A protein has these predicted regions:
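Conserved non-catalytic scaffold segment of RNase H-like nuclease domains
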Residues: 1-93, 134, 139-144, 242-257
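Active-site-proximal helix-loop-helix substrate-binding element of RNase H-like nuclease domains
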Residues: 24-38, 42-46, 103-158
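Alpha-helix capping at helix-to-loop junctions
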Residues: 61, 65-68, 89-93, 111-121, ...
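A general structural signal for short secondary-structure junctions and capping/turn motifs
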Residues: 62-63, 152, 219-224
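Acidic, Mg2+-coordinating catalytic module of metal-dependent nucleases/exonucleases
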Residues: 70-77, 83, 120-186
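Short, solvent-exposed loop/turn segments at secondary-structure junctions
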Residues: 77-79, 111, 237
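A mobile, often basic/glycine-rich helix-loop segment
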Residues: 92-101
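Acidic two-metal-ion nuclease catalytic site recognized across multiple nuclease folds
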Residues: 166-257
Length: 257
């Protein structure tokens, strides 16, 4: 495992950086594909100074020194956070350090997607093989003037993430703080309760879909188990929906959006 992190202040200025790499545990088999993507080799995996446990100890110590903070990376919620949680759990450490004890987590990829939902030309992009705009970090960094030859090493990817986000911050200064509000579940829930209309941006197979929604009354339309608020897609005729029977409404709810 290799990890790289940069501590920033509220103005996005660097305060400190941290990087560490450990030897591969003897019970693990390396992936040849991962070695190629990360420009690594067997020597780097087997001859590092730190054991797996020692490195995780350093990571936990550094995370606690930097807390409370907003932890974010590029596609980190779906990948990096899950790796950290699993490795911390297996080494008998608290796995949810990035979103407890005053910390919150966010994902730079989601901020980039939100920025494009507001302004489709906020950053230069290229098309992927499916004809959609590529949201890959290396692609965005390269096309917007940042050196990306070292992409896929941990600390270098962190540097690229900071540069891409800082460019969005410069181009959309008024919206910058709004993007970070979505790091808090409580703030998002309150926004939905207070606003009469809000927009949801979802990604399916690399394509952005925007939905204009209106929240339903919380006293009657909360999820029975998870207590999530529910809303209606305003593309559809609300009056027609209101006239549906309970069984017909259930059928409509199960259809693909």
């Amino acid at each position: 495992i290799e990890i790289g992190g940069i501590l920033l202040d509220e103005n996005f200025k660097e305060l400190e950086r941290f990087s560490a790499r450990c030897r591969l545990p003897q019970d693990r088999v390396p992936s040849a594909t991962a070695l190629c993507i990360n420009k690594s080799n067997v020597d780097l995996l087997t001859k590092g100074n730190l054991s797996h446990y020692e490195m995780l100890s350093q990571v936990e110590k550094k995370f606690r020194e930097w807390s409370p903070a907003t932890f974010l990376g590029y596609s980190s919620i779906n990948f990096d956070d899950e790796v950290i949680r699993k490795e911390f759990f297996k080494s008998l450490r608290k796995p949810y350090i990035t979103n407890t004890e005053g910390n919150v987590r966010h994902d730079a990829l989601n901020i980039v997607r939100a920025a494009f939902a507001i302004d489709d030309n906020v950053l230069k992009t290229e098309l992927n093989p499916k004809g959609n705009k590529s949201m890959k970090l290396e692609s965005l960094a390269r096309l917007n003037g940042f050196e990306s030859a070292g992409a896929h090493s941990a600390l270098f990817d962190t540097e690229l993430t900071v540069k891409v986000l800082d460019l969005i911050k410069q181009k959309q200064p008024i919206l910058w703080q709004e993007y970070f509000k979505t790091s808090s579940k409580i703030i998002v829930e309150n926004m939905i309760k207070q606003e009469k209309i809000f927009t949801v941006n979802e990604y399916f197979f690399g394509t952005s879909r925007l939905y204009l929604c209106a929240p339903l009354h919380p006293n009657a339309c909360m999820h029975p188990v998870y207590k999530w608020g529910q809303s209606v897609d305003l593309r559809f005729d609300v009056e027609a929906i209101q006239k549906l029977s309970y069984e017909d409404l259930k059928k409509e709810m199960k259809k693909s959006p």
